[in-house]
């Protein structure tokens, strides 16, 4: 495997699969095919929970092995988190598995290694478009002996099981919300929140898909307005009930495809 540093570790459940997983199967293309490269790491299902997108337990959130760490040029400082990509191996008759592709969700960051040139080992250095895959996903499109493999990728819609999930955390005047299981484009680009004692207020991106606001919403039902990268907006009214508590997760409506 070519040198590439992950910001944090993935959790990769043993029962997860590749593009057949119903919660990550892309339904339609959102972009044209583009060229990139991919490599893999030897994933252990018992690895610690982590990920630069804030999803934590990837099995719990429905992503499983069908995940990817994106290079700087693609990660967009976390804005790309949750987006789905269809990936296929190209230009290598020896190692590619013909006619195959996978759909993966962006859940992590492949950090650059500035000690190596971008074209000689620093695979995730700018301006490279690079996908770091768990070996279980990589082997669905190419033989592991390929190492660093030329690929093509495109953005696709994400199909998710159930609705968008809102995991509430924080304390008193500081509220954070992890937004996961987002269908459609998958990557939330802006979030607004509304209690019964306020109008719509913009939340800031804390990191990945964790959003925050400095306000006290205790004792109020909460509504959220999400806008994804394709410009679609989803409003979940009172998805978090009045009796909500920190540490709980609430499920709302889903983006329509």
Swiss-Prot record:
Residues 173-252 form the Expansin-like CBD domain. Pfam families: DPBB_1 (PF03330), Expansin_C (PF01357). It is found in: Secreted, Cell wall; Membrane. Expressed in panicles and flowers. It is a peripheral membrane protein. One of its GO terms (cellular component) is extracellular region. SUPFAM superfamilies: Barwin-like endoglucanases (SSF50685), PHL pollen allergen (SSF49590). PROSITE patterns: EXPANSIN_CBD, EXPANSIN_EG45. Induction: By gibberellin (GA3) and wounding. Transmembrane segments: none annotated. GO terms for biological process: plant-type cell wall loosening. May cause loosening and extension of plant cell walls by disrupting non-covalent bonding between cellulose microfibrils and matrix glucans. No enzymatic activity has been found. May be required for rapid internodal elongation in deepwater rice during submergence. Belongs to the expansin family. Expansin A subfamily. This is Expansin-A10. It comes from Oryza sativa subsp. japonica.
């Amino acid at each position: 495997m070519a040198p590439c540093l992950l910001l944090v570790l993935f959790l990769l459940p043993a029962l997860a699969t590749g593009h057949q997983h119903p919660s990550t199967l892309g339904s339609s293309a959102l972009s044209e095919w583009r060229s990139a490269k991919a490599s893999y790491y030897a994933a252990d299902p018992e690895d610690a929970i982590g990920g630069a997108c804030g999803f934590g337990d990837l099995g719990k959130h429905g992503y499983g092995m069908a995940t990817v760490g994106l290079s700087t040029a693609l990660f967009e400082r976390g804005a790309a988190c949750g987006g789905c990509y269809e990936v296929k191996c190209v230009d290598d008759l020896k190692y590619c598995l013909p006619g195959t592709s996978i759909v993966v969700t962006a859940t992590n960051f492949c950090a650059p290694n500035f000690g190596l040139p971008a074209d000689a080992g620093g695979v995730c250095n700018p301006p490279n478009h690079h996908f770091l895959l768990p070996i279980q996903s990589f082997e669905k499109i190419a033989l592991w002996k390929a190492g660093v493999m030329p690929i093509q990728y495109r953005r696709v819609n994400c199909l998710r099981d159930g609705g968008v999930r809102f995991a509430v955390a924080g304390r008193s005047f500081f509220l954070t919300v992890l937004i996961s299981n987002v269908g459609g484009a998958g990557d939330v680009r802006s979030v607004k929140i509304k209690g019964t004692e306020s109008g719509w207020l913009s939340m800031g991106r804390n990191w990945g898909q964790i959003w925050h606001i400095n306000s006290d919403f205790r004792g109020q039902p909460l509504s959220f307005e999400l806008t994804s990268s394709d410009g679609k907006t989803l409003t979940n009214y009172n998805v978090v009930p009045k009796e909500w508590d920190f540490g709980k997760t609430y499920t709302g409506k889903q983006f329509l495809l």
